[in-house]
Every structure is written in C-alpha cells, then in structure tokens.
C-alpha cells in the first residue's frame, strides 16, 4: 500500500518513488490478467533483450498465465532464446489506443512439458510450427516483474508482480 506526500510517492517502508508515479497495489492474479488482456488486445508487443552490450527488439504475440505466472514462448534455436539464457533481464512493450504497457523483469526458462503444452493449448495456431516435445519449443515466465501502464493523458500506474 502506498500514499502520496508532497508530490512524492512514499511507500510505507519509507522508500521514495519519483514524483508523479502512482503505485497501485492489486492482487497478483488481477495484475497479470490485466497485463495479459492488454497484450492480447494489442495483438503485438515488442520484447527487448540484450545481445552483449547491444539492445535487440522484436515483435512477439504470445502471453499466457500458467500456474500464476506470466509466460511467453519462443524457439530454442532463435537468438532471443540465447540472449535470455545469457541475460534474463528483459522488457516488453505494447501500445493500443493511445495507451501502452511496459513489463520489465527477468524471464526465467521453464522446461516442463506441461508449461510448454499449456502455452500451445492457449495458442493453437502455434501447433503448426511447434509441439511440446519437439525439443525446440521454449517458454519463459516473468520473475520480479514491474508493469507500467501509461498514456499521453494520465500519470503512469506502476504495479509489481
């Protein structure tokens, strides 16, 4: 829970956040559902990773909640997979109707078959290219994530999950 004081956001533990940043505490399930709904409505989001000291950004379309975690999917043969294994810190961004969401955190690989299959069940069109047992399908979930909802007309809302 947070409150505002003198145009600063002061958390109850005494730490400060930048002025005009409002932090909203919600239950994690609601936060992830809101993030996933936004990503799906936007249809495309952009995933940023690091390739050494060079940033890399590419379009993605998968976002799925499995076992209370926000997952994305890629192929092990892709550069993005190698980049995430070398440095799990990543950020995604999607834009729709003058609003955008950014989610920053660590993307952790989950090599369990049930996690891969859950993603493929959520996105049947992927089953033309991937299967849970093909040795290539890979899913990652966000850990220590911060989602920032922004627009051109309102102050950002920051949520953590």
What are these regions (language model features)?
Residues 42-44, 59, 68-70, 87-90, ...:
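Short, surface-exposed beta-edge/turn micro-motifs
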Residues 63-97:
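A short mixed-secondary-structure module that forms the rim of ligand-binding clefts
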Residues 46, 70-71, 102, 148:
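General beta-strand recognition
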Residues 2-27, 102-161:
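Charged, gly/pro-rich active-site loop segments
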Residues 17-22, 46, 61-70:
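Short, basic, glycine/proline-bearing loop/turn elements
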Residues 37-52, 90-93:
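A short, Trp-centered hydrophobic/proline-enriched beta-strand micro-motif
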